[in-house]
C-alpha cells in the first residue's frame, strides 16, 4: 500500500505477498461487496494505534518485520458454496471471470447503440440528401438515370462528351450555361431529360453547327430588336424568295428570308431556347444591308396599298413661285383683316358705352322735370 497524505510519516503499511490462486467470483455484486470489505479493513488497520505499535518495544513495525496478514469475509456465491476465509493479495481483487463477464456485457450494450447510431445516420442521409453527396452518388449508380442501362462511368462520360461537343458548336441550347474552355456541364441539368430528347437536341445542334460553318460571316448581322428582325432580308432578289426558303430549310444555302427568320425565332421562344440567329460577327459591316432594308420597306408599303408613282398626284407636287407669291399675299391680307377687325370692335365698344351714358343723362333730366311740374 502506498502512503496516504493524511497518514503520519512514521506509519508504514506492509504489502502482502501476491498469490498465484485466482479468485472466482460470479457477478459484479459480490465483487462490489469485496471491495467495500477491503476498504473497511484498511481503514480499521490505519486508525487503530494498538496494531501499529509493538507492545514490548514501543516502536512501529518496520518493513523488514513479518508481513501483516489481512482476513476478509467473502459472501456466499450463486453456486451455493459456503463462505470461505481467504487471504487478500491486492487492494482491488478483479477475477478473470468477472472481467470476461463485464466485457461481454459492454459489447452487448455497445451493439444496440451502434445500430441506433447507424439508423439515425441513415435517416439523416435520406432526409438531408444534399448534405451527403457521397450517399446520393452511390444511390444513383444503381438506378437508371439519363441512360436507361448505364454500363460504367467511362461510357457515360463518353456519351456526355458527344452532347457537350454539339453544345459548344451551337449556341441554340440555352438554359445551360456554357463555360469557357473544356469545363464540363453539371450532370444535374441533364437528369430530367429523356434519351430521345437528348438525341433530338444533339441532332439540332449538329445541323446548326454545320449551317453556321458553311455560311460566310459577311452575310449576317446581329438582330437586336423585333424591327430589325422584320427588316432583315438577304441581298438575294425578290423573285427567288421561294428558292431561298427551300434551301434554307434544307440547310445548304446560307441565304435567309424574313419569314423563315421569324418562324425560327417563334419556335425557339416556344421551346424556351434563345436562338442567336445570325449573331456571329458585328465588327464586319454587312454588304447590301441598306438596300435590302429599303426593299423590304417598299415591299411592305406596296402590300399596304401605297403607290410608288406619284407624278400625276397634284397634292404631292412641289409649290411653284406663283403659288408661293399667292400664299404670301393671302397671309398678309388675313393679317390686315384681323387688325382692322380688332380696331372696329374696339371702336364699337367705345360707341356703345357713350350711347349708354347719353341715355342715362336723358332719363335723369326727364325725371327731374316731372318732379318740378308736380310741385
Swiss-Prot record:
Keywords: Activator, DNA-binding, Nucleus, Transcription, Transcription regulation. One of its GO terms (biological process) is DNA-templated transcription. It is found in: Nucleus. GO terms for cellular component: nucleus. GO terms for molecular function: DNA binding; RNA binding. Functions as a GC-rich promoter-specific transactivating transcription factor. Belongs to the vasculin family. This is Vasculin. It comes from Xenopus tropicalis (Western clawed frog).
